[in-house]
């Protein structure tokens, strides 16, 4: 089906372009959400008449997204999750969890604005890309940790996958030879 795009859509085209898309994509997404019109003479004339208002509305949305992007870009958010000693999470951090972390800080974004190809399954610092507008893209840092204190240590650059880092215990003191020496004489066992 041929459609006229009413706004820029990633991987599809710019506003005003006539593009060919699959019928289901047009009927189920583009047309109901008001992102496109069927490409016919009447709709082409309608688009030409409304072009300036559409461009103004798009510019307004872009400027709103840019103001949010200026505040959010490069900012770090902490997500606390349970994890094993190796740093593997018991579960994962998905786009929904990132949105909740942003909402806790007072930012409102939708799930489709977060670009997360696979859920986060390990503790550490992870960069996440967000598309606030078709032309506004930012990167935020998600700090996944077992606790808030651990997140602070992680942000300073410490590795948190050893027993010392997790529990504050020196791994060298946990060696078996320090507990038991088979060659040592036992006290009181002289024969």
Curated annotation (Swiss-Prot):
Q: Where is the composition biased (Acidic residues)?
A: 179-191
Q: What GO biological process terms does the UniProt entry carry, in alphabetical order?
A: translation
Q: Which PROSITE patterns match?
A: RIBOSOMAL_L9 (PS00651)
Is RNA-binding one of the keywords UniProt gives this record?
A: yes
InterPro entries hit by this protein: Ribosomal_bL9 (IPR000244), Ribosomal_bL9/RNase_H1_N (IPR009027), Ribosomal_bL9_bac/chp (IPR020594), Ribosomal_bL9_C (IPR020069), Ribosomal_bL9_C_sf (IPR036791), Ribosomal_bL9_N (IPR020070), Ribosomal_bL9_N_sf (IPR036935)
Keyword Transferase among record annotations: no
Signal sequence span per UniProt?
none
Which keywords label this protein? Ribonucleoprotein, Ribosomal protein, RNA-binding, rRNA-binding
An example Gene Ontology CC term for this record:
ribosome
Task: Name the family.
Answer: Belongs to the bacterial ribosomal protein bL9 family.
Q: What does this protein do?
A: Binds to the 23S rRNA.
Name this protein carries in UniProt: Large ribosomal subunit protein bL9
